[in-house]
Amino acid sequence: MKPNKVIITCAVTGSVHTPSMSPHLPYRPEHIAAEAIAAAEAGASILHLHARDPEDGRPTADPAVFMRFLPVIKQASDAVINITTGGSSVMTLEERLAAALAAEPEMCSLNMGSMNFGLYPMLERPRDWQHAWEPQLLEATRGTIFRNTFADIEAILKRLGEGCGTRFEFECYDVGHLYTLAHFRDRGLVPGTPFMQFVFGVLGGIGADPENLVHMKRIADRLFGDDYRFSVLAAGRRQMPMITMAAAMGGSVRVGLEDSLYDGRDLATSNADQVRRIRAILEGLSLDVATPDEARAMLGLKGGDRVAF
């Protein structure tokens, strides 16, 4: 694994949580832009972005919605913009790719395997749902699979990677996903040093336990030697403990309201709250935080002047 400064990624809104869970979850384009810009000002070098319907907050893959906030963020910040290709588990591959192909960003996420992606346990907490789609979407994950076949992964690598010069945040939800990434690397479809996001705590993926982080890193070391970089995200209350451990092990970190709605014991009032908290932890550990340009150099990105927005 290549050592360097710690990259802070902020996942601003995602498609996991719903508006009824927090009044601070951004879903209108102007709010997503404002939250992203504030997170960058707080120290995030990479902004991971989904889009939501401006009327009711449901996840959307509509490129027109993305284009209502992407240029605003770019004009106000030099942070790396990373667009999802995961979208949500109920979207088709073409829907999930539409915005990224239109925007040709520096980075995109790329999920490394099909899996159960259970959000339905969040139904167990009584709520006054603001919109009918919210419990319906959560319940749908009980019987659906988040599809990321070998053919899907190869198509994304070729269409976005080879076609647009986009680099990837390879999202690995379990050990087998590391072997899938190695498979595509060995076939020549993953040039350069891969940037892996170890994802912990999603129901259907690997649990958010320290032993699992050690195991994931050990397998990555075996498969990639020192030619990789890794970051960690953890869902919910395990967010800060797991990413702090990752940083101490030489990795980078991801925060944001996509992954956890909390800052300490209370609801986070903004994405920037979480960025400031992890930045303070990193600085307390005498770890240097990467600037956007340092992150670009570490990850071999094409630069913000070569995107289509």
What are these regions (language model features)?
Residues 107-256, 268:
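Catalytic alpha/beta core domains of metabolic enzymes, predominantly
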Residues 10, 58-83, 156-159, 216-225, ...:
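Alpha-helix-loop-beta-strand connector modules within alpha/beta enzyme cores
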Residues 179, 218-222, 241-309:
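Structured C-terminal cap/extension of enzyme domains
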Residues 20, 45-67, 199-204, 261-265:
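Glycine-rich, proline-tolerant flexible connector loops at the mouths of alpha/beta enzymes
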Residues 60-147:
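Active-site beta->alpha loop and helix N-cap motifs at the rims of alpha/beta catalytic domains
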Residues 1-24, 127-133:
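N-terminal small/glycine-rich loop or linker at the start of catalytic domains
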Residues 32, 39, 50, 108, ...:
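Conserved, mostly hydrophobic/aromatic
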Residues 14-31, 85-93, 142-147, 169, ...:
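Active-site mouth loops of central-metabolism enzymes
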